């Protein structure tokens, strides 16, 4: 468990406490520099393990040093979704009643069902897919909402990082989805002559979540909101047989 040097530089001070092998270890940092060596400060039971990181953001790097609770909750929830059976708890120390716990045994499927509940679906069961090669893996869940859309989920992640601006993994997903449905319709003569499906046709009212895990992802910008690495070789063909 660690924070990168860049992350530490963005904090006025932070402290890491690690419980391992029956001992409590602590190390302190300030303005990106080590303030104390790793030292043992106590003892615990051998099964009592974990890491606590306390930090204070440096306002010179941010518009405000206050944490956006709504955004933080979404990020924590996403981590629970993308790691099945991981239990994440949130407590707001400024408002003791503001507590939430997230746990999704079925991962993407559980999350998709929760986010688009109380709506009519095209498919009784969503399409769930999981594929991997030696270096990369990609999972997705998708269903279509019928009638009036109350809440439409369109989310993508790379290595548990939300990619709000999409990128090649999302483009590959959309391309694979379009080609799958075009091939299905053409093979069964379901479309009138001269009519072709477009991406807008197949993505309208589509609710989906995509999770990619890559060995060497390449992001655009420091916020990592868009993936630049071409993933068409894994994200497009692996979807077609499933869909």
Which residues fall in each region the model found?
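GHKL-type ATPase core
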Residues: 5, 9, 13-116
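GHKL/Histidine-kinase-like ATPase module
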Residues: 40, 70, 77-79, 85-224
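Ordered hydrophobic segments in well-structured contexts
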Residues: 26, 139-141, 209, 233-236
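Single conserved hydrophobic/aromatic residue that forms the stacking wall/gate
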Residues: 1-8, 12, 232-243
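Short, conserved micro-motifs enriched in small and acidic residues
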Residues: 5, 167-171, 230
């Amino acid at each position: 468990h660690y924070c990168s040097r860049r992350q530490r530089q963005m904090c006025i001070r932070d402290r890491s406490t690690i419980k391992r092998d029956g001992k409590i270890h602590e190390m302190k940092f300030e303005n990106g520099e080590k303030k104390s060596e790793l030292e043992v400060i106590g003892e615990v039971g051998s099964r009592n393990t974990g890491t606590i990181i306390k930090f204070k953001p440096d306002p010179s790097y941010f518009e405000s040093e206050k944490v956006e609770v709504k955004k933080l909750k979404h990020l924590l929830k996403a981590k629970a979704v993308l790691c099945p059976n991981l239990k994440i708890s949130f407590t707001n120390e400024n408002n003791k009643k503001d507590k939430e716990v997230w746990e999704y045994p079925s991962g993407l499927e559980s999350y998709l069902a929760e986010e688009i509940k109380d709506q009519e679906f095209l498919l009784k069961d969503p399409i769930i897919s999981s594929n991997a090669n030696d270096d990369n893996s990609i999972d997705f869940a998708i269903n279509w909402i019928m009638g009036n859309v109350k809440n439409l989920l369109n989310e993508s992640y790379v290595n548990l990082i939300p990619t709000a601006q999409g990128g090649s993994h999302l483009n590959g997903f959309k391309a694979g989805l379009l080609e799958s449905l075009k091939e299905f319709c053409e093979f069964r003569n379901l479309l009138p002559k001269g009519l072709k499906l477009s991406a807008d046709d197949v993505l309208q009212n589509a609710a989906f979540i995509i999770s990619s895990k890559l060995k060497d992802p390449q992001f655009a910008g420091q916020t990592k909101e868009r993936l630049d690495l071409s993933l068409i070789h894994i994200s497009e063909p692996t979807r077609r047989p499933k869909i």
